[in-house]
Amino acid sequence: MKRYLIFGAGAIGASLAAQFELNGIPYLLCGRGEQIRHIQAHGIRYVRPEGARSLGLQACADRSELVLTQGDVLVFTTKTQDLELACRDWAWLPVAGSGPARTASELPVLTPQNGLAAERIALRWFSQVYGASINTPARYTELGQIVVGGYPEPGLVVVGRYPQGEDELAAGIAADLCRAGYLAESRPDILRWKAAKLISSVRNNALDLFEGPSDRLQAYAAALAQEAIAVLGAMGISPARAQERRHSVSHWGIAPGCGIEPGQQSTWQSIARGASHEVDFLNGEIVRLGRLYGVATPFNQAIQQAVGQLCQPGRSAQGVCRGQIDQLLSAARELAARAG
């Protein structure tokens, strides 16, 4: 039987562990820092639209306590900027029991990060990489509490072998996620599904840190998405469409009054907690790929630069610092003029 080792106790990792706990799927939540220690000592307060409950989770804060086995699947739920360190930490740990895997590097790895960089990073250390595109409206801003507002299922997941392919393990992971309550499926073209999620992340995530007239915010969001679509097109990637899902998702959404607030997505939450953000691997990924494929990306470049400046040490001492959309528009137009 598979056991899922979940590395990272944030919104995605802890909610995944909670769903596994509630549905009898073998798992272990691994992490470091205050959150995992709190979970070990007190469990977690897991808030869903149907109510809140306190859960004891199987958790590990010390690698020396962990024995890897042949049936383990490693699930890295850290943000992309932290993934390389996590891969280095875990790849060369020994695997117990008789079987083909001698070190963790030979065990299958699941990467549900936003963007397109995680799988490429993981391949440097792991031979079996499975990408995942996950849509789980979740909030982690308070120690020991995770809010998940997806309803009726906590989230939507697509799994596939990277860079392409659909096999028995991918199908098995998707089946386990369905047992855990998610609406999940395996597909052979995981890059297309991750590309579709990247467009959404690029359009909305970093823009939560800016304020101004709604029409200008919407226009900027549209420009971010248009640049992402152009870059992906230059790469030969056609993003997946919602109607391609094998399961209907027309019934699914964010429950009203569930604690998931507009304008407070993962980047806003990270900065609110004083943690690092992933904008360099979202908008910054579009900028990087645009440079490689000869596509101008001034709007994504401007917001990447602006978020980097907003998040300099000492800038967020009074909470989440916000930029102004008019200044951001001016910066993007200046970059576009230089490129033109």
Residue ranges of each PLM-predicted region?
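Rossmann-like NAD(P)(H) cofactor-binding subdomain of soluble oxidoreductases
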Residues: 53-145
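N-terminal glycine-rich dinucleotide-binding loop that anchors FAD/FMN and/or NAD(P) in oxidoreductases
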Residues: 44-61, 201
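Nucleotide donor/acceptor-binding cores
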Residues: 2, 72, 107, 155-157
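NAD(P)-dependent Rossmann-like dehydrogenase/reductase catalytic/cofactor-binding core
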Residues: 218-340
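NAD(P)+-binding Rossmann beta1-loop-alpha1 motif at the extreme N-terminus of oxidoreductases
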Residues: 1-52
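Rossmann-fold dinucleotide-binding core
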Residues: 112-197, 203
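N-terminal glycine-rich phosphate-binding loop for ADP-containing cofactors
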Residues: 202-223
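Residues at the starts of beta-strands that form the adenosine-phosphate
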Residues: 3, 26-28, 108, 128, ...
